[in-house]
Amino acid sequence: MKKTYAVITGASSGIGMAFARQLAAEGYRLVLIARRENRLQALAEELNKSGTESMIITADLSEKEACYRLMQQLEPVPVGILINNAGFGDCGSFLETDADKEMQMIDVNVKAMHLLMKLMLRRMEKQEGGYILNVASSAGLLPAGP
């Protein structure tokens, strides 16, 4: 088992879940973060059965204060990797998509990723090491959404 934890946002499904399973197979301890506690709990139970130490934190990263709370919760945790994976998209005609949903999307996909990267990078600089992976989608290159 590795000494440090891998922190994964958006861990409850898709790419985040795949990262969790892969890093567990490589011996990392995990901090799994997402909005849906039931999905996080199911993943943590699956990984714990295979001997992986994992903890879950529910957070809505569209809220700036949730990012700061998350970093406070991580203070006692030896973090070696941050996988900044939380995000979502929307599709449809620009004039027909919901503006509030788009603002929330920007809050998660851009602002939360930026803030968590900045705060974790400061921490990693003090501890003289660590890795950050920011996950993005090619969907941003398509004409379907903001």
What are these regions (language model features)?
Residues Y5, S12-S13:
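Conserved glycine-rich cofactor-binding loop
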Residues N38, T58-R69, A99:
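The beta1-alpha1 cofactor-binding region of Rossmann-like NAD(H)/NADP(H)-dependent oxidoreductases
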Residues I83, L116-M120:
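Hydrophobic positions on the long internal alpha-helix
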Residues S93-L95, K101-I106:
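Substrate-binding pocket helix/loop in short-chain dehydrogenase/reductase
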Residues E26-L43:
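Conserved glycine-rich Rossmann-like NAD(P)H-binding loop of the short-chain dehydrogenase/reductase
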Residues N85-D90:
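Conserved NAD(P)H cofactor-binding loop of Rossmann-fold oxidoreductase domains
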Residues S137:
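Residue(s) in the substrate-gating loop at a strand-loop-helix junction
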